[in-house]
Amino acid sequence: MDLPMDLPMDLPMDLPGPLAWLVDEAGASPGADRFLAELGGRLLADGLPLAGGALTLAVPHPIITRRTWLWRVETGAVTEALGFAGGPLSPAGRGSAGHDWLAELGPVQQHTVGLPPDCPVLGWAGTRPFGPVEAGRLRQVARFVAAPLAALAARAALAALLEAYLGRRSAARVQAGAARRGTGETIRAALLSADLRDFTALSEATEPAAMIATLDAWFDRVAGAVHAFGGEVLKFIGDGVLAIFPVTGAPSEACEAALRAVAAARAGMAHLDAARQAQGLPPLPFGAALHLGEILWGNIGAADRLDFTAIGPAVNLVSRLEGLCRPLGRSVLVSGAVAAETTTPLVPLGQHVLRGIAAPCAVFTLPDA
């Protein structure tokens, strides 16, 4: 039957509220966590007996293979669980993060959205077993969720890759569209510069594959400590690391966080050296320096090859200060700017002239460094 030509083209679809939201608005959700909480809240308001929900997305990341968001009705909170390479292959079913967590809340109904093996998985836990009609409604939700999840998965994949290779700060800038050459931001922060001692000799005596594994182990200890105390790794340069602890409140908080990160990195490297010794391998001595100042974090480079990098007097100073570790026979050096902001016991080492730095620098160290 032919429809009248003057029939309005925007006739409303007779869809339940949650499905209408999936069609009209869900694709613009700022993140998977907000998407899951919003969808769960709408299903709950629509009468479904939910205790919680879980959403799993595959991500193209060197280490993380899946991200699972877990929503609990009782608190409204959304938490995140990571699946790593070498873990369970299936993102759904018993043994997966989403299913096992939901099973603690109540009866589980789980749906794959799309084709395996990398399809999203959406699951729900009930306060009681889902009836046939309720189960059918959840299956219908799984069908309507495909389009907005495709958009979310694409954004999550891009974010994962950018964060893995650029770091959080640069990834956020690129995603926000601030990728034009010559742009940057001034950041006041506690700076950490660290690198391995005798790296050139070690690399000449070590097979390339073993050298890569050694660097990975070293970077894991340093970057892990930096991230654990709220810092961010800006650069890996050869065997070196440049990290910052941005000043968001009192400068002393950033300095204390940087000092705690150095302590954690030293502890991690001590365990690594013990493991290497048991394998008949040499230890990995390193030097680290801390300074407080302003850096310019900018997008610079050639017209067809850009990079985010940190420049400024503070970067130069912390790099030169780290180079003083070997001459002074110390593994950790701290500038006077950091020493003035911390209550951590430090040992003064006097004023030192740093190459390329106009004014002498007051240098301190840790008692056991």
Please name every model-derived segment.
Residues A97-V121, A125-R128:
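Helix-to-coil/beta transition segments that act as allosteric "coupling" elements at the rims
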Residues A135-T186:
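Regulatory cytosolic signal-relay segments
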Residues L43-L105:
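Structured interaction and signal-relay segments at domain junctions
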Residues C325-A369:
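Cytosolic regulatory/linker segments at or just downstream of nucleotide-handling modules
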Residues R181-R260:
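Catalytic NTP-binding/metal-coordinating core of nucleotidyl cyclase/transferase enzymes
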Residues D216-G230, V247-A288, P313-L324:
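Alpha-helical scaffold within the catalytic cores of cyclic-nucleotide enzymes
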Residues G123-R139, A310:
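Regulatory loop-to-helix N-cap segments in sensory/regulatory domains
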Residues D24-E38, M211:
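Signal-transducing coiled-coil linker helices
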